[in-house]
Design a protein with these regions (language model features):
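Extended, low-polarity segments enriched in aliphatic/aromatic residues
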Residues: 29-328
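Bacterial Sec-dependent N-terminal signal peptides
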Residues: 1-26
């Protein structure tokens, strides 16, 4: 039988213009009719991933993009082909990625394709590097920092996107989930530079004021969401909470995870989904061999929860949610 648990959304202190450590604080309880639904399973397996997709009740259609991170190296904690194969093949999906902005093993298409082959992704599906043949601009609702979102041109080839993210820490954003996966992740190389710089440049690596960077990510995430909410298109969101290092999958030598795996969560609301995952991390009671404190500290140090706060302000979704377990 399906079990439903209503969770209180936890929020970070608002209003900091620079990057200061912030403490996760509780928000008022949700009221009926306001909460988004977030589905959850503790079964981190190919079968569990398919079941969480099916629980959403939104059928992938047309040309389906499955947005993943291919990982900087085999030492990274990216989602492995064996885990995602069944879902990708069930929806006849194409794995999609974009080149990075920091060099490394995925800084250009040739290197990226070699990395994709080495990881084994070619063995389970077609892989499309969306900015291989250029980029396009998507409109943004919020022009406080970025004036548009620069994404791989192949994005326009797809009718449906499954944003399949690995939830973990991040050296710059504090954490990475579905919002990062469709902002930085869907952006072309120039688009990544544009977001990281808070709209200052598309041609060189420039670090923005921390909140400007986080707010730019939220604005870019909304641009992609809105693109797939046009008639005939759609998008859904999945976070896999395993191998949760404090470091992102763009790190070829990440710190070892200190917190044990939690599960897979999914929603049609990206803000609610990332908020639910944050709350699971911050509500976690640490014990020997299962310590959430390093990840909590990384998120707080980078003011990471401001991304979901700002995304909610933009109308991308809500931080209020109900978790529905699909486990028996």
């Amino acid at each position: 039988m399906t079990k439903t648990t209503t969770i209180m959304a936890l929020v970070c202190i608002l209003g900091m213009a620079s990057c200061h450590a912030q403490t996760h604080q509780p928000a008022p309880p949700t009221t009926e009719g306001e909460a988004a639904t977030v589905y959850m399973t503790t079964d981190i397996s190919p079968e569990g991933l398919v079941r969480i997709y099916e629980a959403l009740g939104v059928e992938a259609h047309g040309r389906v993009a499955v947005k993943i991170s291919t990982g900087e190296s085999e030492n990274s904690n990216h989602l492995r082909p064996a885990l995602i194969k069944n879902l990708v093949q069930k929806v006849n999906g194409t794995l999609v990625e974009c080149n990075t902005a920091y060099g490394g093993n995925r800084g250009d298409t040739k290197k990226h394709r070699q990395a994709i082959a080495e990881r084994g992704y070619n063995d389970i599906a077609t892989v499309d590097i969306m900015d291989e043949e250029g980029e396009i601009q998507l409109p943004v609702k919020d022009t406080k920092h970025i004036q548009y979102d620069i994404v791989g041109s192949h994005l326009q080839n797809y009718d449906f996107m499954i944003n399949l993210a690995h939830f973990k820490g991040h050296a710059m954003g504090g954490f990475g989930g579905v919002l990062k996966n469709q902002s930085i992740g869907v952006a072309s190389t120039a688009g990544k530079l544009y977001i990281h710089s808070g709209g200052k440049t598309q041609t060189r690596w420039t670090i923005a004021n921390q909140d400007a960077f986080l707010e730019s990510m939220a604005a870019a995430a909304q641009a992609v969401h809105d693109y797939f909410k046009q008639e005939g298109k759609d998008i859904i969101y999945i976070n896999v909470m395993n191998n949760m290092s404090v470091d992102c999958d763009c790190d070829g030598h990440p710190a070892a995870p200190r917190i044990k795996d939690i599960g897979i969560l999914a929603s049609t609301d990206p803000v609610a989904l990332d908020q639910a995952c944050l709350d699971l991390v911050f509500n976690h009671v640490s014990s020997k061999g299962n310590d959430a404190k390093p990840l909590q500290e990384r998120i707080n140090k980078k003011h990471g929860t401001h991304t979901v706060e700002y995304a909610e302000q933009l109308g991308l979704g809500t931080r209020k949610y109900t978790i529905v377990s699909i486990d028996d």
